C-alpha cells in the first residue's frame, strides 16, 4: 500500500481565512495535492503526487466533520481527466458543482498520468505514440524511447485508495461514496469490491464491463507496446458525433467548453500540433468475480446511444453484481458523454437521489427509463 503525505490545499476564488458569514453560499474550488510513493510500473517506488479537486459551499469548508455521509469522490475514465469530465466550466454542466450545491463535499482525483497529477516522463516523448499517431508531432516516424506499461489497473486502485484515505482523514468519515465514468467503472467498482468498508454508495455512468474477461484480467499489463495515446479535437468531435441519436442531443458550445478545459488540463499536449489530450494506455480491468462479490449499493446509468460501452454490457453488469440494492437507468437521448448533453440534469438528479435516499424515482432495485415519455420500473 502506498504511503500518503497530506499537503496544504490551495483555495479559489477566495481564501478560506477570509470567509465571512455572507460567503456561506459561495461555491469554492479547492486544489489538493496528495503525495504518494508510486506503484505505477513506469515510476514504481518514486515520489509522485495526485491532484484532488474539491467543490464545496464556503459555509462547510471549515467544518471538517460536518458532512457525515455526504462526502463523494469522482473517478475518471481512460482518457478525460476528472476536472474536465465532472467539473466542466459551462453553464450548469458541472456534476461536482451540482452535488456541492446540494450540500455535499465533493472531490475528484486524477490518476497518475492524467491532468495535474504526476505524468511519467515517457509521456513527454511523442516517439512513444503509435507510429501512425506521430504525424504532426515529429518530422518523421521514430522508435519509442519507452515501450512498456505506464500504469496498470492495480496502480489505479492504489491511486483511488490514496485519494479515499486522504478524503476520509480530511473529513473524519469512515466511508465515502464513489462516482465514476466509463473505464472509471473498473477503477471505482474494482476498488469498492476490494474495500467495501470504505465505500458507502457507488454510481457509474457507462461502466465498462466485460463478462468474458479472463480471471487474471486485473493482472494484465501492456508488456512491450505503445504506452500512451492522444486525442485531437477532430477525434473528440468524431467520436461524439457518431453517438448522436436524437435532435439537439448536445450543444456545440458545450463541446467547445469541454475541449477548452481538456487542453488546459494538459499544457504539454496543448503544444503538440494543433493541441491534443495525452493519456496512458489503460491496461487490465476488473473481473466478473469482482463484480459478483460487489455488495455496495450501485446505481449504473447507460446512455441510449452509447457506442463505447453498449447498454447491453451494462445490463450484464446489473445482472452479475451481488448487491441487493442496485438500479440500472436507461437514459434517453444520451451518449457516452451524457453529463455534457441535454439530459445531464436527469443524470445529476438521479445521482443525488441515490446518494441521499438510496433510490431513483423511489426505486431501490430495478431497471428504469429516464427521459422517455415517463419513468417506468421493472425488476
Where does each model-flagged region fall?
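N-terminal cap/lid segment of alpha/beta-hydrolase-fold proteins
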Residues: 22-67
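Short, surface-exposed "cap/lid" segments of acyl-processing enzymes
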Residues: 59-108, 120
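Conserved acidic catalytic loop of the alpha/beta-hydrolase fold
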Residues: 134-147, 157-175
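Short glycine-enriched nucleophile-adjacent loop
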Residues: 185-196, 202
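Active-site nucleophile loop of the alpha/beta-hydrolase fold
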Residues: 203-212
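Alpha/beta-hydrolase
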Residues: 212-301, 379
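Conserved alpha/beta-hydrolase "acid-adjacent" motif
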Residues: 307-313
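Catalytic histidine-centered segment of alpha/beta-hydrolase-like enzymes
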Residues: 334-345
